[in-house]
Amino acid sequence: MAVNIGLNLFRHELTPAEVVKKSREDRFFAREIIDGIFTDFIEFHGDRQSGDDMSVIGGIAALNGKPVTIIAIDKGIDINDKLSKRNGSPEPWGYRKAQRLMQQANKFHRPIVTFINTPGAFPGKTAEAQGQGEAIAKSILESMKLTVPMIAIIYGEGGSGGALALATSDQVWMFQNATYSILSPEGFASILWKDSKRSDEAAGVMGLTPKDLLNKNVIEYIIPESRNHPRVFNLIRKRLDDEFTRLNELTPDELIAQRRARFRAF
Amino acid sequence: MDLYENQRSTSKIKRDASVNDRIPDGLFLACPYCGTQMYNKQLGDYRVCAKCGYGFRLQARERVALLTDNFEEMDADIEMTTPDFPGYAEKLARAKSQTDLGESVLTGVANIEGEQVALGVMDSYFMMGSLGSMTGEKITRLFEYATAHQLPVVLFTASGGARMQEGINSLMQMAKVSAAVAAHQEAGLLYLVVLTDPTTGGVTASFAMQGDVTLAEPHALVGFAGARVIESTIHEKLPKDFQRVETLLENGFVDKIVPRAELGQIIAKIVKLHHRTEI
Ligand SMILES: [Zn+2]
């Protein structure tokens, strides 16, 4: 059950279309989240095959003193940053960087936490030539085999396969004003109704809000948002630590079986 | 769950249920790839363009009839509650009656040139081969069956991508099938993918690109994002063979392009070379 925090008690509940709008606003930035929750973050670059995608930030850090691997999709802060990150749309080598860091975490028995904010994987010419589909497919397949706990947090947009690539995890959490969907409401409306202007209506029927997704067991937890960001980060830090501690008690076989069963239910 | 339930044995299914057989022989057709015009009957049994080798889209049952010596269908009638999306139930019903399938994939145990395999064939005539919950369920069960019975999986992909009407559940199928692929892989079993025209979206971004061996039919269109989406994103016209398997082969994402008539032989050969032998 989603628990409303006091702040929101006197506001009306947002409509799905309003949640979509909010999810696209610059409410939280990846680096701010990382610095707010963890200490000693050290960024690692590159996929060791073809390049370094700036839209995927990865590295290691400490969570209450314990090592974790962090992988975050970032939309960027200023206009140049946003352009270089294609508004948070990773290239195949972004997903391959993520895969490399996942394997590294697995080797050193570090839990993995991903932060997701993407309209989707980048639909580009080079992206296709470099195997965007294969990159996502492999991320999903490899994360099904990881013997370390993995928690995914969608903090803005969770767009389609580009988001799923980093969310085939033991748990998925969403910020209160985040979305997770098969495609954008605009795309949905234009494909099904041949009218992208009906996107607000589409948002209403797509079931893309955290509340909808919690009801469907697509996610486990809704993170209440607040203008007081440190409060949000403290809550996430505590919960991550608790859940990783709990998940670490499982044997690798149990962990994998549980993760696969989580998706087998759909 | 009894996997033998709902099995239907069909030996050398006749092709008379297919749309193609309803096309008169004298009808003039144009090859969707090279544009060459020809009479329907010139395509022959395999329905291949005589000029460029492009394989016209087949229905799943037609493919099975052409490819296998024996086929026992599984999970023909599993029912799932479909989401209450306006118009969806009608669309599904129409697709079912048009294709003689329960979903956009046909699964079963097949004999191909003497080799026993777990076979899945997607059907682009069934709601564009989109990935619904039942599609994912049938493919997942195929992998689970193959893992339990130590069989290789041969999967022919054809898909327009996600099943929009099913929303997030469609997305979850990519993960569900991948988990079953992972278990099959860990059992040391062969997963052979045959990419057929068209394979796109969520299917490309999951099980179509997870095979140990990846074959493709000539000139099949295979990609993640739609060409129009890409063109409007990068404001550039895409070259003719963009997202054709010949380009994917060049870029390293396909093992071999095989003309349709030779597929059975090549598949059997690859499966045979994966028989476990004591050395
Ligand atoms: Zn042709």
UniProtKB/Swiss-Prot annotation, chain B:
Q: Which Pfam families match?
A: Carboxyl_trans
**According to its record, what are the GO cellular component terms?**
acetyl-CoA carboxylase complex
The annotated subunit structure for this chain is: Acetyl-CoA carboxylase is a heterohexamer composed of biotin carboxyl carrier protein (AccB), biotin carboxylase (AccC) and two subunits each of ACCase subunit alpha (AccA) and ACCase subunit beta (AccD).
Name the gene for this chain: accD
Q: What is the lineage of its organism?
A: Bacteria, Bacillati, Bacillota, Bacilli, Lactobacillales
Q: In which pathway does it act?
A: Lipid metabolism; malonyl-CoA biosynthesis; malonyl-CoA from acetyl-CoA: step 1/1
Free-text cofactor note: Binds 1 zinc ion per subunit.
Keyword field: ATP-binding, Cytoplasm, Fatty acid biosynthesis, Fatty acid metabolism, Lipid biosynthesis, Lipid metabolism, Metal-binding, Nucleotide-binding, Transferase, Zinc, Zinc-finger
Output one GO BP term: malonyl-CoA biosynthetic process
Q: What's this protein's name?
A: Acetyl-coenzyme A carboxylase carboxyl transferase subunit beta
Q: Which PANTHER family does the entry link to?
A: ACETYL-COENZYME A CARBOXYLASE CARBOXYL TRANSFERASE SUBUNIT BETA, CHLOROPLASTIC (PTHR42995:SF5)
What superkingdom does the record give? Bacteria
InterPro entries given in the database record: AcCoA_carboxyl_beta, Acetyl_CoA_COase_Trfase_b_su, ClpP/crotonase-like_dom_sf, COA_CT_N
ZnF locations on chain (C4-type): 31-52
Give the residues the record marks as binding Zn(2+). Answer: 31, 34, 49, 52
UniProt record similarity statement: Belongs to the AccD/PCCB family.
Recall the GO molecular function terms of this protein's record: acetyl-CoA carboxylase activity; ATP binding; carboxyl- or carbamoyltransferase activity; zinc ion binding
Job description of the protein: Component of the acetyl coenzyme A carboxylase (ACC) complex. Biotin carboxylase (BC) catalyzes the carboxylation of biotin on its carrier protein (BCCP) and then the CO(2) group is transferred by the transcarboxylase to acetyl-CoA to form malonyl-CoA.
